[in-house]
């Protein structure tokens, strides 16, 4: 029989082994006690285990308490997996899983959740706890338990997500407390924590399709930040491609408005083609024919240049705006198109006045075989005065014009852009005061300078010139009767150009009067109609002016036909078989506006200085 001391020593060793076994099994999350709470083999009573566990782990940190804390954590994780998704609802006829987010954006919270779900919040808080609460030195059993728990959680929901990388993704990204995750599918996350998050232009993007949305920003169905979901009550966001709103198609579908667009397009093509060809022909005739370089023809070529500029530059921009309700060059075209148009009106006004003065001088010198004695410098000086005066008088239009955008009420459509008269308050004081003065006097200045001055002055000068021509015709001899007829013909041409100009400028003045005095009683559609009519009449004037010159002025029509038929042998043979009387009339007609020549000049001399085409 053994001694009692040996029995006590054996019992002490058994208790020590049981204590070590309880500690190891608690660290692994396994309870050693059985259902009847009795000790098996080398185990001890549950009360001893509970007491030893409390002594080993500290108050409230026994193995059973840790197991109790783990159960709600798993329930929270399951609830997070079964939570509602934030995807867009599927469009009709598309994949039903393509978008459940609009439903979530309408029913769900407009902003981010206040805090991530339970497990993530607990991990983030654990990373911020001081190290002394978990023990010092070697890793404690609680740390081992957390590591094993995280490894067990790796599965369909958290495969490849380690506790360390997940903790870093929350701790190292600035403003991590404001970041949240939007699941794309139920049970699938929208983020990856294998690699550090990379910043994109619109937010923080993870890797392998994981994306972190910014506060108040929901992800699209494809998980990209480029296409933002419009949240209720917030502004619409999107990438640069989505910001490019669709332009209006004026030709489809076929409606009453599309028929009007086709009519506008066809009319503009006719005006563009006729105006470009006619004005280029006038400029080429004057530049390539030495005998046509008189002061009057130079003025007409200058007028043709500005008409060409109006048609070539302004007409496409105006038509584009009329069809799409958008200015092609935006603010630049809004300012430069009115400026060129008003400058063209000034050039036309001053050119008509200069032509009237030139015709009056020609009529008073008919009996002396009127010849142009002005040199090139004198002609250049007159053209420079016309240009500088017209450009300076039109300069306030650049200051007054501002681009305004109006919403059409159609989703996805570009807002309508209008070029309105509005003075910017950012201008310097001097320019601002001048702009206000010009704006208050613009109506009467426009009417007086660009309508009354050319029409009244031209009509008055034409009447005086016609009277001089009649007096010269009564006292003339048969030798210069043809010259007098040509002067009368040219005077009628100037009057016809003035009538055409006055007719085309009337709608612009009517539009200005309506805008100044009757703007409240007239609808916007009526104002738009008046504007487009005045624009088209201005282009029509620029298109018809060369046609009128070719019809009423024989030197221009003959030179145009020679330029068109200079390569045709039939036209050359036909021109060589004319009668001597016709040759004399043509010779007199061509010399009517020729520089540095008289009627007595020989045909050979004339032929040597003339160049065709």
From Swiss-Prot:
Glycosylation sites: 36, 222, 239
Keywords: Cell membrane, Cell projection, Disulfide bond, Endoplasmic reticulum, G-protein coupled receptor, Glycoprotein, Membrane, Receptor, Signal, Synapse, Transducer, Transmembrane, Transmembrane helix, Ubl conjugation
GO BP terms, alphabetized: adenylate cyclase-inhibiting G protein-coupled receptor signaling pathway; cellular response to reactive oxygen species; dendrite development; dopamine biosynthetic process; G protein-coupled receptor signaling pathway; locomotion involved in locomotory behavior; neuropeptide signaling pathway; positive regulation of dopamine metabolic process
Compositionally biased spans, kind Pro residues: 109-119
Span list, region Disordered: 80-138, 152-172
Segment forming the signal sequence: 1-26
Tissues expressing this chain: Expressed in brain and spinal cord, and at lower levels in testis, placenta and liver, but no detectable expression observed in any other tissue. When overexpressed in cells, tends to become insoluble and unfolded. Accumulation of the unfolded protein may lead to dopaminergic neuronal death in juvenile Parkinson disease (PDJ).
Short name of one Pfam family: 7tm_1
InterPro entries per UniProt: GPCR_Rhodpsn, GPCR_Rhodpsn_7TM, GPR37_orph
Cytoplasmic domain ranges by topology: 287-299, 357-379, 465-493, 553-613
Residues exposed to the Extracellular side: 27-265, 321-335, 401-443, 515-531
Membrane topology reported for the UniProt record: Multi-pass membrane protein
Superkingdom assignment: Eukaryota
Site positions (Cleavage): 54-55, 167-168
Post-translational modification comment from the UniProt entry: The N-terminus is cleaved by ADAM10 metalloproteinase; mediating limited proteolysis leading to the release of receptor ectodomain by shedding. In addition, cleaved by FURIN between Arg-54 and Asp-55.
Compositional bias (Low complexity): 89-108
Subcellular location, record wording: Cell projection, Dendrite; Synapse; Cell membrane; Endoplasmic reticulum membrane
A GO cellular-component term linked to this record: receptor complex
TM helices/strands, residue ranges: 266-286, 300-320, 336-356, 380-400, 444-464, 494-514, 532-552
GO molecular function, one term: ubiquitin protein ligase binding
Disulphides: 334-419
Location, primary (coarse class): other
Function: G-protein-coupled receptor that plays a role in several physiological pathways such as resolution of inflammatory pain and oligodendrocyte differentiation. Acts as a receptor for several ligands including prosaposin, osteocalcin or neuroprotectin D1. Ligand binding induces endocytosis, followed by an ERK phosphorylation cascade. Acts as a receptor for osteocalcin (OCN) to regulate oligodendrocyte differentiation and central nervous system myelination.
Self-association and partners: Forms a complex with PRKN, STUB1 and HSP70. The amount of STUB1 in the complex increases during ER stress. STUB1 promotes the dissociation of HSP70 from PRKN, thus facilitating PRKN-mediated GPR37 ubiquitination. Interacts with PACRG. Interacts with MPDZ. Interacts with CNTNAP2. Interacts with LRP6; this interaction promotes LRP6 maturation.
Similarity-based family: Belongs to the G-protein coupled receptor 1 family.
Protein name: Prosaposin receptor GPR37
Organism, scientific name: Homo sapiens (Human)
Lineage: Eukaryota, Metazoa, Chordata, Craniata, Vertebrata
């Amino acid at each position: 029989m053994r001694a009692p001391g040996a029995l006590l020593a054996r019992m002490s060793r058994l208790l020590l082994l049981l204590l070590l076994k309880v500690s190891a099994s608690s660290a692994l999350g396994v309870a050693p006690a059985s259902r009847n709470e009795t000790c098996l083999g080398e185990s001890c009573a549950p009360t001893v285990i509970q007491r030893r566990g409390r002594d080993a782990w500290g108050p409230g940190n026994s193995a059973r308490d840790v197991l109790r804390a783990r159960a709600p954590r798993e329930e929270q994780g399951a609830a997070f997996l079964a939570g509602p998704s934030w995807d867009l609802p599927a469009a009709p006829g598309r994949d039903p899983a393509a978008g459940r987010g609009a439903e979530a954006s309408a029913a769900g919270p407009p902003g981010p959740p206040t805090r991530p779900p339970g497990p993530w919040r607990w991990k983030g808080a654990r990373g911020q706890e001081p190290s002394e609460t978990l023990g010092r030195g070697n890793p404690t059993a609680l740390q081992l338990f957390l590591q094993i728990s995280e490894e067990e959680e790796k599965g369909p929901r958290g495969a490849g997500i380690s506790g360390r990388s997940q903790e870093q993704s929350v701790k190292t990204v600035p403003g991590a407390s404001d970041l949240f995750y939007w699941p794309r599918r139920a049970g699938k996350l929208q983020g990856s924590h294998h690699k550090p998050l990379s910043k994109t232009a619109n937010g923080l993007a993870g890797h392998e399709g994981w994306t972190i949305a910014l506060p108040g920003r929901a992800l699209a169905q494809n998980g990209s930040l480029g296409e933002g979901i419009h949240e209720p009550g917030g502004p619409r966001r999107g990438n640069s491609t989505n910001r490019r709103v669709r332009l209006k198609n004026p030709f489809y579908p076929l409606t009453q408005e599309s028929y009007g667009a086709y009519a506008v397009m066809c009319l503009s093509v006719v005006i563009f083609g006729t105006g470009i060809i006619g004005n280029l022909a006038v400029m080429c005739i004057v530049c390539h024919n030495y005998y046509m370089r008189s002061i009057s023809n130079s003025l007409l070529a200058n007028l043709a240049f500005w008409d060409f500029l109006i048609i070539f530059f302004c007409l496409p921009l105006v038509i584009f705006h009329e069809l799409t309700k958008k200015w092609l060059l935006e603010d630049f075209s809004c300012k430069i198109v009115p400026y060129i148009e008003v400058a063209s009106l000034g050039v036309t006004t001053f050119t008509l006045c200069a032509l009237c003065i030139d015709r009056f001088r020609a009529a008073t010198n008919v009996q002396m075989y009127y010849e142009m004695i002005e040199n090139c410098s004198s002609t250049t000086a007159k053209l420079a005065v016309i240009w500088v005066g017209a450009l300076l008088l039109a300069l306030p239009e650049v200051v007054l014009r501002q681009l305004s955008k109006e919403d059409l009420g159609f989703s996805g459509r570009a807002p309508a852009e209008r070029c309105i008269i509005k003075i910017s308050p950012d201008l310097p004081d001097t320019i601002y005061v001048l702009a206000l003065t010009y704006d208050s006097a613009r109506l009467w200045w426009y009417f007086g300078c660009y309508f009354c001055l050319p029409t009244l002055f031209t009509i008055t000068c034409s009447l005086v010139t016609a009277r001089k021509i009649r007096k010269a015709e009564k006292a003339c001899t048969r030798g210069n009767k043809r010259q007098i007829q040509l002067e009368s013909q040219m005077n009628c041409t100037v009057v016809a150009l003035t009538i055409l100009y006055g007719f085309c400028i009337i709608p612009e003045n009517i539009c200005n009067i309506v805008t100044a005095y009757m703007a409240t009683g007239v609808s916007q559609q009526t104002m738009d109609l008046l504007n487009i009519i005045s624009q088209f009449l201005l282009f029509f004037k620029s298109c018809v002016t060369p046609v009128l010159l070719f019809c009423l002025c024989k030197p221009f029509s003959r030179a145009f036909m020679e330029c068109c038929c200079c390569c045709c042998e039939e036209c050359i043979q036909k021109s060589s078989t004319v009668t001597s009387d016709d040759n004399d009339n043509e010779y007199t007609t061509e010399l009517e506006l020729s520089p540095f020549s008289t009627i007595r000049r020989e045909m050979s001399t004339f032929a040597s200085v003339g160049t065709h085409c």
